[in-house]
Amino acid sequence: MTPDYQLSAIKATETLIKYGIKTAPVDPLPILKQIPGVFVMTFAEASDMAHMDRKDLLSLYGCDNLDAVTNVYLSDDKKHYVVTYNRLLPSRIVDMALARELGHIVLGHDGTRPEDVRQEEARCFAHHLMCPRPLIHSISASNLRVTEDLVRNIAGFPDCCFSCIRKQPGVTVPAELNCIVRDNFMPYIINFFEYQRHAAKYDGSALADLGTYMDNYIE
């Protein structure tokens, strides 16, 4: 069975629109918390609730789920999800893991399809959510040369995540969806580079720190 990469990309784009994402780096945690029937907690919180040592809990989840895992259960014929994540990992690794779990939920994965197919689709969803193509188009529309370093800095991606994005197969997302996301990001991109030019006058850097920028960002 072949993963449906196009559906994953479309669903990620629709998620950005539905939850009004207009700035980067994209944070999947607030999105997860807004979805009815989804409960999010850390591994530490889960171990406290289960009265189980954290290491034993991680062993129970398995070595493939040390960043985040989602458990699904039915109640009143409705799906409910418990997303548990490891907040001790670097923040952007946690964000990618949560974006992947969000993908499983949005794509309606329920275990009826092969594990490798579901994982590929969820990863594709995460990549399109965290580094949406329309965000890159917004940078290009600002008359700046799009480079990997520039995109990585704005999207907040570690190198390993960015390399995974480049390996994703080409997909087609409806133009009207891409236009909405691009237009949503444009004010942020314009503001971002105005701040960079201003900051460079004082510290001589070519690209000021993203965290400092967010502290000064005004909608």
Question: Where in the sequence are the language-model features?
Answer:
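Active-site hotspot residues in diverse enzymes, especially metal/ion-binding acidic/histidine motifs
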Residues: 1-219
